[in-house]
Amino acid sequence: MMQERKQKGKILVFSSREICYLSSNFFANQIGAAFEKLGYEVTVCELSKEDDLDAKLARYIGQPYRLILDFNSLLPRMVLDDGTPYVDRLAGPFFDYILDHPLFHYQGLSSGVKNLHAIVLDEAQQKYVEKYYEKVASVHMLPLGATRAVYEGTKEPECRILFPGTYDRPDAVYQIVENAPEPLGSMMKDLIERRLADPTLPMEEAFSQHLKEEELELPAGQFALFMNSMYAVDAYVRDYFRKAALDALLAEKLPVTVFGEGWEKYSCGDGHSLRREPAVPFALSFERIAKAHVLLNVSPIFNRGMHDRVPAGMANHAVVLTDENPYLRRTFTGGKELLFYSLEKPDTLCEQAERALTDVRLREKIAASAYETFEREYTWKRRAEQILAFAEEVEA
């Protein structure tokens, strides 16, 4: 097997930064194991603040790799003593798997690194990077894979809706908007209004609409810089709709459990239907999801893509109740693999939640169909195969 791996080549996977709930380390090890199963010799390098980065990173320079992969990478920002970007000294295509909106990664994407390829979770975000970060060598759209719980156990006795995620009070986030200098503050308020009115409107399209109505034009670099400066818009929209979803469900006294950071900040009129559970490392979240009957997804930051909560629920036999967008509608069949609702119409959320909570046969049918789709399309092995195809494509 070792000889076969040497013939196939080497793959280097980084975890260059700690992402919420230690998810970067988890993703790096999951995809690394998948590459190994495909016969590649894999090195997973996890970086920390305590490391001697120069010494740790130098060992990989000049070694031939089939591909190099990182998640929300810090490496495109790193420069060697001679001024050469570190990534450009790596012998193999470097892929940065971006797990949120690329607007948050302005510094890395605009670094001018020649050997930088991006993978994003959303089709609109793919077009955004292609248009506004022209120096990025290639851009690919690929939702994350998912993992089955190691110890699935049995479903919890009470049928409840589980929402795993982070929360902050929308009014607290809005203070960033209020305190922003002009014209940034007015722009951000306008973008928020547009995105609340149309939750499937990508932020960059909202900004383009604003500029057109104001008869303003910005070169690509400045457009991307303004987007980065208006990060609070994305954060506000996310938390606004998370609060709205929970408010609607709890107003109907539907049982909801939340777990993750920040939920102590959430308050509602009727707390009897709400349970709060503490955050856990990402690797342990699948055990909790596997016990749930219904998994809620609220992700207005992916307007043409998919948050990893969706395949996580599919992999662990939880019925995924998700806000709809054009990509999800095209990729899945409502009532077969997922249940859809509209962020614009809270009553659709409550109606679908009621169906999921009360119809056992529907839950069994959807969970079984969704699991088949997961096995076919959303395993880490499948993701490894697709990333290898990207590497072949960029080197052709």
Q: For each of these PLM feature ranges, what is it?
A:
Residues 1-7:
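Extreme N-terminal leader/targeting regions
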Residues 12-22, 26-38, 43-47, 111-112, ...:
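Catalytic binding pocket for nucleotide-activated donors in carbohydrate/polymer assembly enzymes
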Residues 109-113, 153-161, 353-357:
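Short, surface-exposed amphipathic charged segments that create phosphate/polyanion-binding patches used
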Residues 7, 15-23, 27, 137-303, ...:
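Nucleotide-sugar donor-binding catalytic core of glycosyltransferases
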Residues 2, 12-16, 24-132, 147-151, ...:
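Extended catalytic core of nucleotide-activated donor transferases of GT-like folds
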